[in-house]
Amino acid sequence: MEILMTVSKFASFCTMGANASALEKEIGSEQFPVNEHYFGLVNFGNTCYCNSVLQALYFCRPFREKILAYRSQPRRKENLLTCLADLFHSIANQKRKVGVIPPKKFITRLRKENELFDNYMQQDAHEFLNYLLNTIADLLQEERKQDKTNGRLANGSLDSQNHNSNAPPPSTWVHEIFQGTLTNETRCLTCETISSKDEDFLDLSVDVEQNTSITHCLRGFSNTETLCSEYKYYCEECRSKQEAHKRMRVKKLPMILALHLKRFKYMEQLQRYTKLSYRVVFPLELRLFNTSGDATNPERLYDLVAVVVHCGSGPNRGHYIAIVKSHDFWLLFDDDIVEKIDAQAIEEFYGLTSEISKNSESGYILFYQSRD
């Protein structure tokens, strides 16, 4: 049995090596970007949801640069952030240009820290992205808090560490990169008073419709909703419940806009989630038109830099891959396999025009990076 396992592993790595060699030849030594590395990630049992998100984040340059800068700081005790920093550092400092890396330490830590991922079942890539970004932000905030406490202890001002303890946690570079702000506007139809409430986000989840575009979906996200009957709005000016119009607008656009397409819908008659393989076009360039009147950067223009693609018919079955833009060309990362693809091939991941077949390769999470 051990001999068979060894032969199998050897054959697998030979295949990886051949794939890497082919990729290097296809890109060409003269065209290969300086200080760039393209490494597939080994699948440790249905960890494609993790691999695809990590590849997408690696090619979000502002995020990669912050992670690598964190790695150069004095070492701290192991956590999910240090494991991610070690993985990115390992990729960025390989002697070879292409190849395969096993993200074993990161996966082990992930499974240790969150029981949701502590199994060999397929998980949701969006849930993982959300967990990862929030965990990194929490760790950075905790480290900053510890550093300030240690500094106060060194200065002999222990009593001040609880000063302003009710203040919101400080912003981190995760927020600087991914955080945007929505404003929820409600207009009373009786007195015309408008009230608004801001809400921060690290990614936007949008409903999908058949044969549409991501621009259409984003406009739908901001459609005006009428609050009436039992859903009337309590107006502070009128001091009573009134009919009102409610809509969501984008007040602050993030540096990197992560868009989650809500492709999994719970079907009551089936008692389970099913996939909406609708064809939703996502352009290489994007500008949002559903910004608020007081938006800080309404004209911000975005370029598509990465897409996490779901292949299959449901959330707990199928496979995840990532397509990323690196310099002037596109790459497809399928766990340990890395291939160069044409920009036109991205159209294959829009979804299906027919609802008969639910099995498709569909864009699931889009990463747009601002030009400014």
Swiss-Prot record:
Domain of life: Eukaryota
One Gene Ontology cellular component annotation held by this UniProt entry: plasma membrane
Active-site annotation: C48 (nucleophile), H319 (proton acceptor)
EC number(s) stated in the UniProt entry for this protein: 3.4.19.12
Region (Disordered): 150-169
Top-level EC class as recorded in UniProt: hydrolase
InterPro entries associated with the record: Papain-like_cys_pep_sf, Peptidase_C19, Peptidase_C19_UCH, USP_CS, USP_dom
Residues engaged in binding Zn(2+): C188, C191, C235, C238
Keywords: Hydrolase, Metal-binding, Protease, Thiol protease, Ubl conjugation pathway, Zinc
Residue ranges constituting the USP domain according to the UniProt record: 39-371
Gene Ontology MF annotations: cysteine-type deubiquitinase activity; cysteine-type endopeptidase activity; metal ion binding
Reaction catalysed by this enzyme: Thiol-dependent hydrolysis of ester, thioester, amide, peptide and isopeptide bonds formed by the C-terminal Gly of ubiquitin (a 76-residue protein attached to proteins as an intracellular targeting signal)
GO biological process entries: protein deubiquitination; proteolysis
Subunit field text: Interacts with WDR48.
UniProt record similarity statement: Belongs to the peptidase C19 family. USP12/USP46 subfamily.
PANTHER family per the UniProt record, alphabetical: UBIQUITIN CARBOXYL-TERMINAL HYDROLASE (PTHR24006), UBIQUITIN CARBOXYL-TERMINAL HYDROLASE 12 (PTHR24006:SF647)
Protein's UniProt name: Ubiquitin carboxyl-terminal hydrolase 12
Organism name: Salmo salar
